[in-house]
Amino acid sequence: MQTFAEISALREQIKTFKREGRRIAFVPTMGNLHEGHLTLVRKAREHADIVVVSIFVNPMQFDRADDLNNYPRTLEDDLSKLNGEAVELVFTPTPEMIYPEGLDKQTLVEVPSLSTMLEGASRPGHFRGVATVVTKLFNIVQPDVACFGEKDFQQLAIIRKMTTDLAMDIEIIGVPTVREMDGLAMSSRNGLLTIDERQRAPVLARTMRWISSAIRGGRDDFASIIEDASDQLRAAGLHPDEIFIRDARTLQAVNTESTQAVILMSAFLGKARLIDNQVVELVKDSKEEVDSIESESENSH
């Protein structure tokens, strides 16, 4: 495994691999790697000869300075895990390398509509920061394929649209969410939880399953479902951030043409903002009567 901090050195090595006809897969991360990230690496291995992983905590996508400062950084442990997966190349740039003139003078990439709805509405600039850094990393690595987790459902949709709109010749592969034994979606932010908070955290996934069951049972009173779900989270000590029920394909309101809904949830627990999602098949009778209701839960953080 080779580790590069300099863009030019990484590019030279990738050019060598490409001259040899090697297929390149890319997994961008912000470090603090867990089994979910390693699952992405293994999926990347299935689609390419060479796997490149980046570790970069992107300041442009954080909307709160304390969140950026608190984000876990575990480079030595991350490199050990990647070495265990036989990753060929690891890219570990500094913010100064990615944004040499600072964030204020950086050319920006923004995917309209998708970036400003749902989570993007409450986190202005977040998805612009994601799209910008992913575009830059794609230009540096020049991968044939890139793997992203489905846990960040809206982010994956944005990256798919971005690569299509900008005619990037990169195959985007979504990888299902990896969960702990108790159902909690694996996340680097889980490390911010205290022992007590960690015991309560699976309530997010359980509440999501309750919503899914209600929808599969034919309920289409989404506003009431969201209100009840918010109450369940509060009862367990979580602070609901956002709960949406949307068309899984368009992320717009569910309508009579929708065949699948996606439940998008986030909640605060201590210092951590937890997110999760689940796709649900819509009951035909329910679809025909749905009033395209969707609502954001009361933000009580």
From Swiss-Prot:
GO terms for biological process: pantothenate biosynthetic process. It is an enzyme of class 6 (ligase). Its main location: cytoplasm. Beta-alanine binds at residue 61. InterPro entries: Cyt_trans-like (IPR004821), Pantoate_ligase (IPR003721), Pantoate_ligase_C (IPR042176), Rossmann-like_a/b/a_fold (IPR014729). It comes from the Bacteria. It is found in: Cytoplasm. The keyword ATP-binding applies. It catalyses: (R)-pantoate + beta-alanine + ATP = (R)-pantothenate + AMP + diphosphate + H(+). The reaction proceeds by a bi uni uni bi ping pong mechanism. Belongs to the pantothenate synthetase family. Catalyzes the condensation of pantoate with beta-alanine in an ATP-dependent reaction via a pantoyl-adenylate intermediate. PANTHER family: CYTIDYLATE KINASE/PANTOATE-BETA-ALANINE LIGASE (PTHR21299), PANTOATE--BETA-ALANINE LIGASE (PTHR21299:SF1). This is Pantothenate synthetase. It comes from Vibrio vulnificus (strain YJ016). The gene is panC.
